[in-house]
């Protein structure tokens, strides 16, 4: 699907990466935003502890955003709102925040989910900020918000291993690799 994704500019299969920041490993999963890929979305949402809702500063909430956010809120996931592309020009911040709040209300967000933090960003320029008035110099404000707003994973480290595999990859040196979330127990290197 990579060729189709590049050609159409959409995400079909989830992409997973990890960032080590301030002593914490943050796993980030880019999931399809469209209902046509609902199976992929549901599979991935079972692995995450919270979601980042990316909103285009100029275009606002996209129609495909509704599907994924509705699923995430229905599963009780906490959302962190990232207003991206704030470098592209003027936009009405108040109107955009109202649009986001209406979306959360329409989708049945509970009180905890409705109390979401907003981060302003320019992914293209590589910065994030907690206020629109100042441009950041890096993505630290976004990563700090992830650590403070998204709940840490829960699980029983002492129980038998329970691993939810969500993706299978291949490496020519290692072979097949199962990528997933450890719900119980632990895995040792070696």
Region roles according to the model:
Residues 1-190:
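Structural and coupling elements of P-loop NTPases
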């Amino acid at each position: 699907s990579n060729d189709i994704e590049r050609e159409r500019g959409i995400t079909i299969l989830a992409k997973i990466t990890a960032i080590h920041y301030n002593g914490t490993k943050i796993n980030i999963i880019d999931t399809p935003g469209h209902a046509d890929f609902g199976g992929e979305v549901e599979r991935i949402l079972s692995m995450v502890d919270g979601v980042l809702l990316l909103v285009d500063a100029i275009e606002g909430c996209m129609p495909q955003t509704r599907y994924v956010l509705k699923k995430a809120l229905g599963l009780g996931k906490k959302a962190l709102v990232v207003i991206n592309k704030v470098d592209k020009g003027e936009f009405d911040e108040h109107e955009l925040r109202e649009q986001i709040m209406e979306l959360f209300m329409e989708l049945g967000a509970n009180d905890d989910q409705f109390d979401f933090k907003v981060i302003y960003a320019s992914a293209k320029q590589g910065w994030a900020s907690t206020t629109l008035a100042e441009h950041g110099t890096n993505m630290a404000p976004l990563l700090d918000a992830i650590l403070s707003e998204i709940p840490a994973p829960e699980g029983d480290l002492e129980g038998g291993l329970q691993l939810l595999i969500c993706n299978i990859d291949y490496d020519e040196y290692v072979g097949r690799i199962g990528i997933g979330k450890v719900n119980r127990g632990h895995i040792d290197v070696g």
